[in-house]
Design a protein with these regions (language model features):
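Acidic helix-start/capping segments at beta-turn-to-alpha-helix junctions
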Residues: 23-40, 97-98
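Beta/coil-rich, acidic/histidine-enriched accessory regions frequently appended to metallopeptidases
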Residues: 7-10, 175-222
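Surface-exposed patches in mature extracellular/periplasmic domains of secreted proteins
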Residues: 14-30, 88-93, 124-127, 164-170
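Active-site-proximal alpha-helical
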Residues: 15, 105-106, 110, 114-121, ...
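Second-shell loop/turn segments in exported
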Residues: 1-3, 57-67, 95-101, 138-144, ...
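Zinc-dependent metallopeptidase catalytic helix centered on the HExxH motif
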Residues: 49-121, 167
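Zn2+-dependent metallopeptidase catalytic core
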Residues: 1-29, 73-76, 80-83
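Charged, often glycine-rich, active-site loop that binds/positions anionic groups
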Residues: 35-51
């Protein structure tokens, strides 16, 4: 178990550093031996103990180190971002969730970005979105691509404004309760201006890459 413990500890530190936020409650991780137990495992707690988290992280011990790390990052990101945005208790989450207005792609996109960074698969999907739908209207991209288009937003702001851009947007979103306001107070530009820059960033990248064969499953064709 030592190698798994080392991997999880390292991944948690990386996510906390990216978000500039540390969980106020312990994150429970349970290792199971069979894939079926991923859905059926029931956690037995000691008498008098109460978990304030919305869920635990359950990992299949037989999965590859890469799969374990990706799953852990995704679930950790979900726990940390939800706590950061909505509070650590059930009462806080119910109260704050009704007050903060965020695009439906924002948080799932961040979870995807923190879990997989900018993987070949994510880039392939974003390239397809660019070719199929264009990037003129961010909101017109179908919602089935919320994870990827959201991840593309976070990748762009981190590239343009630096690593502190991610926690800045999240913090200002919680304070102002509005996405557009969080963008303005974080970067002193309007959301429309930011998405124009986002479009230019990806248009330029993919247009420069047009002469190269499209990758298939992350493998570049010769």
């Amino acid at each position: 178990m030592a190698p798994i413990d080392s991997v999880l500890s390292s991944q948690l530190k990386n996510i906390q550093r990216t978000l500039n936020y540390h969980a106020s409650n312990p994150i429970d991780v349970f290792i199971v031996n069979k894939a079926a137990e991923m859905k059926t495992e029931k956690v037995k707690k000691q008498p008098g103990s109460v978990s304030l988290l919305s869920g635990q992280i359950i990992i299949n011990v037989h999965a590859s180190t890469q799969d374990i790390a990706s799953l852990f990052r995704k679930e950790c990101a979900k726990i940390l971002v939800e706590e950061m945005m909505y509070g650590g208790t059930f009462q806080d989450k119910v109260k704050t969730n009704n007050l903060i207005s965020l695009p439906e792609w924002l948080i799932p996109g961040l979870q995807h970005y923190l879990a997989y960074d900018w993987s070949a698969e994510t880039d392939n999907t974003m390239r397809y979105i660019h070719d199929q739908y264009g990037l003129t209207n961010f909101d017109a991209i179908p919602s089935i691509y919320n994870d990827v288009k959201g991840a593309s937003f976070w990748k762009f702001v981190a590239y343009k404004y630096g690593p502190n851009a991610i926690p800045s947007v999240l913090y200002m979103a919680r304070v102002t309760r509005k996405f557009n306001a969080s963008v303005y107070y974080s970067f002193q530009v309007s959301a429309n201006e930011l998405f124009e820059d986002w479009q230019e960033f990806y248009d330029y990248g993919y247009l420069q890459d047009q002469k190269k064969p499209n990758p298939v499953n992350g493998v570049m064709l010769s």
